Amino acid sequence: MKRISILGVTGSIGTQTLDVLRFHKEDFELVGITANRNIELTMDIIKEFSPKYVAINHEESYKKLVDLVKSQGLKCEVIYGMEGLVKVATLDEIDIVVTSVVGMIGLKPTVEAIRKGKDIALANKETLVVAGELVMREAKENGVKILPVDSEHSAIFQSLQGNAHNKIDKILLTASGGPFRGFTIEDLKSVTPERALKHPKWNMGQKISIDSSTLMNKGLEVIEAHWLFDCPYKDIEVVVHPQSIIHSMVQYTDGAVIAQLGVPDMKLPIQYALNYPNRQGNISEKLDLFKIRELTFEKPDLDTFKCLKLAYEAGEKGKLMPTILNGANEVCVELFLNKKITYLQIPEIIEECMNTFDYNKEVTLHNVINLDKEVRQYIYEKYN
């Protein structure tokens, strides 16, 4: 039996991970969980899965959960804040950590888990974006497997199995194109948060839905792929594939292209990461090739969707530039959702930050966290 901690258990990836655990009850034990504000769902999870440790990152929610757990006689330790996240990620009794929290908050617990020798099922792409050099070095030194949960990176990971890494010609990273595929800049001027949250293929949280609409999500995935697969940016090509059936591909030097296909369901890559190197029974609808009318492919429009272009630039510059990109994007998405800035201001402000801050420093946990704070403070003071 594999023992698991889930960081961000009440979010989209976290709840779908629970679906996988329900489907394979005999194979997994949920030992630790973390959450933020959704105490009602957290209580339901505690009652169903009986985790020993629960970390809450929101102070009022933490106090509320402590009272509920005590009043109902539930046997779990409730811990507060970043200290709690790190504890849940580094428990002696766990084998693997599912990092499904959104944003920079996932960095420290992920790094500490790696240092404790825990395998990582990685859904928190920001960790590799801002500190890929550090994370991959620590993983290598500690003999830890980084198993991608993103559908695209899982597809690449699977397409690489049994093939020589030095024979890769390019990685073909697929993108649905988001809800505004084919839009012009003029069309994007009137985009509201409500429209941007409606993704055509995937059911996701708010932040990743906005990122998918701007193509920043794909940009972050380009940087993530660079670190996961040690692939130069010039050899990572984004391919818009609206049907979202091919989750990504690898083209080899002999011209062969190996792809992973499946229905758009995050439970598939979650299950693969948790069971690697084995494959488990089918948890999702199987792909019916006869129902697929067509598979189409387009080049992304980098002039209209500038976030993808900025991500490539940040990745190429390296050092702490991806930290600036990521921190600026997180704040811009928050301000856009709160209707403080317009949709087209998102890439404008990100580019402004990339031109403002010094990125040419060593990638350490300290430097990443400090620069991230500076970038956020700058945007809040100027635009909030």
UniProtKB/Swiss-Prot annotation:
The record's EC number reads: 1.1.1.267
- Tell me, which GO biological process terms does this entry list? isopentenyl diphosphate biosynthetic process, methylerythritol 4-phosphate pathway involved in terpenoid biosynthetic process
Provide the cofactor list for this protein. Answer: Mg(2+); Mn(2+)
Query: Which gene name belongs to this protein?
Result: dxr
What's its catalytic activity? 2-C-methyl-D-erythritol 4-phosphate + NADP(+) = 1-deoxy-D-xylulose 5-phosphate + NADPH + H(+)
Q: What does this protein do?
A: Catalyzes the NADPH-dependent rearrangement and reduction of 1-deoxy-D-xylulose-5-phosphate (DXP) to 2-C-methyl-D-erythritol 4-phosphate (MEP).
Keyword annotations from UniProtKB, A to Z: Isoprene biosynthesis, Manganese, Metal-binding, NADP, Oxidoreductase
Residues reported in the UniProt entry to bind Mn(2+): 150, 152, 221
Q: GO molecular-function annotation terms?
A: 1-deoxy-D-xylulose-5-phosphate reductoisomerase activity; manganese ion binding; NADPH binding
Q: Which major enzyme category is it? A: oxidoreductase
Pathway the protein takes part in: Isoprenoid biosynthesis; isopentenyl diphosphate biosynthesis via DXP pathway; isopentenyl diphosphate from 1-deoxy-D-xylulose 5-phosphate: step 1/6
Its name, as the record gives it, is 1-deoxy-D-xylulose 5-phosphate reductoisomerase
Supply the InterPro entries for this chain.
DXP_reductoisomerase (IPR003821), DXP_reductoisomerase_C (IPR013644), DXP_reductoisomerase_N (IPR013512), DXPR_C (IPR026877), DXPR_C_sf (IPR036169), NAD(P)-bd_dom_sf (IPR036291)
